[in-house]
Amino acid sequence: MLSLQTLAKKVVACNYLSSDYDYTLQRFGLWWDLGPIHLCNTCKQIFSYQHLQCFSEDDLCLDAALVKAVKSDNLELIRLFVDWGANPEYGLIRVPAVDLKRLCTELGGLTPVSESRLLEILKEVADLKSCAGVLLGYDMFCHNPLLETVTRTTLNTVMYTRSKIPLTGDTAHLLLTKFWFALALRHNFTKAIHYFYEKHKNQLYWRLACSLYFNNIFDLHELCSKKEICISPNLMMKFACLREENYAAIYYCHMLGASPDYGMNLSIYNNNTLNLFFCIDLGATNFDRARLIAHRVYMYNLSNIFLVKQLFSRDASLVLNITEPQAIYDMLKTYTSKNLKRAEEYFTAHPEIVVID
């Protein structure tokens, strides 16, 4: 149960007061650096003039406020945010070792976070799938000495299961930066994307690779409009073809000049049949080379069907001059491959060419 003082502070924080009350709010403990602290009555999130903004769709601003208060060693605000419902464990993750025992005592005899619990919290924050969650995760875990005891294999496994993209890096900090950046790009959290890119300009290649891998052509379009694309369209196609059903990214690469034949061949190597037929629908025609590649990777049914070249043709319903992301997504919303359907019908009519594994 909240104390009377804590409850009173909460009521005051939920109301906007004029600047005439600034001195009172400072004395009342509802002040953070350059402005008063507010608690949104609608979304129940906390924000202040400098530190946070209110996101009605996100649910972690209060915990983010706690982490920032811990990093600035503001004990009064730490107590206040915990009383209001912030998870004290999230704060303990960011406490310098010399202050850990003191803060555990202040928060009612809590024990330091164990390694297993640390990894569980990392999963919890990643699973929030919110802009505020991504930014909080970065704030909590990057440059965090507690992770020094976690093996690289364990950390890589946890991050891969959440991001679904292979991560590489010389340090835990770099790995975690790329991890949270990848999550922001996967879900197109624009605010988080811009925050990471502003802090890590050297990660342009990673931003581009993730946008292609996660089919995020909104971000690709932004990079193109700012003329920040740093690699060739065919190399971009290589990233787009890594993941099945990345139709929008493949289409966008083709609009930039990537060859649909190259995309078709990459899709065969990656065993991504749907991407393969999408490239044929876009106009891929070099079936002689595709047949050789399919045979080389033991995809004998594909190799056989490519002998029937007259079966395939470009899908005229895929308009080839759209560059606006939403228009591309809308066009592909009802897309099904006509060439894949023809291939399936041909196999049904000619079972003698089907190779049973």
Swiss-Prot record:
Domain of life: Viruses
Signal peptide location: none
InterPro entries associated with the record: ASFV_MGF360 (IPR002595)
Subcellular location(s) per record: Host cytoplasm
Pfam families, per the entry: ASFV_360
Alphabetically ordered keywords of this record: Host cytoplasm, Host-virus interaction, Inhibition of host innate immune response by virus, Inhibition of host IRF3 by virus, Inhibition of host RLR pathway by virus, Viral immunoevasion
Stretches assigned to coiled coil: none
GO biological process, one term: symbiont-mediated suppression of host cytoplasmic pattern recognition receptor signaling pathway via inhibition of IRF3 activity
Stated role: Plays a role in virus cell tropism, and may be required for efficient virus replication in macrophages. Also inhibits the host cGAS/STING-mediated type I interferon production by inducing host IRF3 degradation through the proteasome pathway.
Family: Belongs to the asfivirus MGF 360 family.
Subunit record text: Interacts with host IRF3 and TRIM21; these interactions mediates degradation of IRF3 through TRIM21 and ubiquitin-meditated proteolysis.
Protein name: Protein MGF 360-14L
